[in-house]
Design a protein with these regions (language model features):
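ABC-type nucleotide-binding domain
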Residues: 4-7, 11-166
Length: 166
């Protein structure tokens, strides 16, 4: 049974600001003797780059996983736009977050079909804007078919860095 449960009185809206704040956050994996994260406090401001730096096993991925509630903090609070993520409706929370896993995976199809996976109604202009944001516009424009360029299963026909940006 999941320890992450939807709220009974969930908040269904947030602002368009998308500020993420960790307020004295702790996290301990079930059955672990020691916490992975201890008293972490910081704010990730919209439009700014926030770097999470640490050695292997230091909790970087765990920290990022707390925002979309892949896990819930065992202490402290994770807030999006001032609202505790545990109070946000899951659909609202997930619609506000773009999570790029360490091992990126692409489906067989086209650049456009992969980009539209999470939002089928996205326009070509919106796809180009997303590619700009991900610093992928230049290499996609260099492909002969651009948005309609074929993508092999798993993204085998693009580099690891390109795969992650897509």
């Amino acid at each position: 049974e999941s320890s992450v449960v939807p709220p009974t009185d969930g908040v269904s809206t947030t602002t368009d600001v998308s500020r993420v704040h960790f307020d004295h956050v702790d996290f301990t994996y079930p059955g672990a003797d020691a916490p992975v994260l201890c008293d972490v406090t910081f704010t990730a401001e919209p439009g700014r780059t926030t770097a999470i730096i640490g050695s292997t096993g230091s909790g970087k991925t765990t920290l990022v996983s707390l925002v979309p509630r892949l896990f819930d903090a065992t202490g402290g609070t994770v807030l999006v736009d001032g609202v505790d993520v545990r109070r946000l409706e899951p659909e609202v929370l997930w619609s506000r977050i773009g999570l790029v896993p360490q091992r990126a995976f692409l489906f067989s199809g086209t650049v456009a079909s992969n980009l539209r996976y999470g939002r089928p109604d996205a326009t070509d202009d919106e796809l180009w804007a997303a590619l700009r944001t991900a610093q992928a516009e230049d290499f996609v424009r260099a492909m002969p078919e651009q948005l309609e360029a074929p993508v092999a299963q798993g993204g085998a026909n693009v580099s690891g860095g390109q795969r992650q940006r897509l």
